[in-house]
Amino acid sequence: MNAQELDDVYTRLAYALTEVGEEKTSMVLARLVLLLMQRVGDASAVSAAIDDAVEGFRP
């Protein structure tokens, strides 16, 4: 995915989350993550992405 595609997909996600509303955002993101995990199909790659995502947020 190039930079423009990444920006387009991020923008699409932002609009979709706005459309469903703040109260449903976490559920939509959780569902999206589960769907992407299935499509990636590589447990170590998904685990590494989880580690990257939480970096800087852990106490």
Describe the role of every protein-language-model region.
Residues 4-12, 17, 23, 37-43, ...:
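N-terminal intrinsically disordered, cationic/polar leader segments
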Residues 27-35:
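Amphipathic alpha-helical interaction segments
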